[in-house]
Amino acid sequence: PYRRQRQMCIRDSLYVAPRQYGLAQQHKHLREMCAIPGLTHAPVFAPIVANFYSGMETSVALFASQLCPGKTAEDIKAAYAAKYTGPVVTYRDPACDDGFLSAAAMSGKDSMVVSVSGNDERILLTSVFDNLGKGASGAALECLNLVMGREKGFGLDL
C-alpha cells in the first residue's frame, strides 16, 4: 500500500508544474499552420499546458533564414500590426512589460493577443488567449451569430 501511495504522489506532483507536449513534432495543428500561411517547412511547435483554470499561450519559433530574402522580424511586426487590429485578434508590441508573458493574461476574454519578439536571428511569434472562450465555445457562438444574422462578436467578451 505504501509503495502505491508513493507512486500516486509522484505522479500527482508531475501535474503541478507546466508540461510541454507535441515533442515529436506531430501536433495535430501543424498541417493547418503550414497550409494557411503557405509554409514549405513546418515550424517547431510544442505547446505547454499547466494546471490552472483558463488561459493559454502558444509560441512558434522562426529563424531569420526561414523568411523570404530581405525580410526581417520588423517586417513581421508591421504585417501583424496591419492585420491584427481587433477586436477578436489584436497585435501588441511589446508582448509584455516585465519580460514575462502570462498564459492567464486573457483569462475570461473571447479575444486573442498576438506578438512578435526576439532578435535579428531568432524570432518568436506568440499568442495569448483564453482556451475556454477563444476555443470551441467561442467558435460555436460566432457560428450561431452568423446563422442568426448577428454581428460576429455578439455575446462575446472581446
Positions of PLM-derived features:
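Active-site-proximal loop/hinge segments within enzyme catalytic domains
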Residues: 11, 44-63
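Short Gly/Pro-enriched turn/cap motifs at secondary-structure boundaries
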Residues: 21-25, 48-51, 102-106
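Substrate-binding strand-loop-helix patch
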Residues: 31, 51-55, 68-71
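Glycine-rich active-site loop/strand segments that organize a redox cofactor
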Residues: 11-24
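Short, solvent-exposed beta-strand edge segments and adjacent coil->beta transition regions
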Residues: 16-18, 55-59, 122-124
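Single conserved hydrophobic/aromatic residue that forms the stacking wall/gate
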Residues: 1-10
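Oxidoreductase and adenylate-handling cofactor-binding alpha/beta cores
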Residues: 30-43
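C-terminal active-site/capping subdomain that shapes the small-molecule cofactor and substrate pocket
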Residues: 61-158
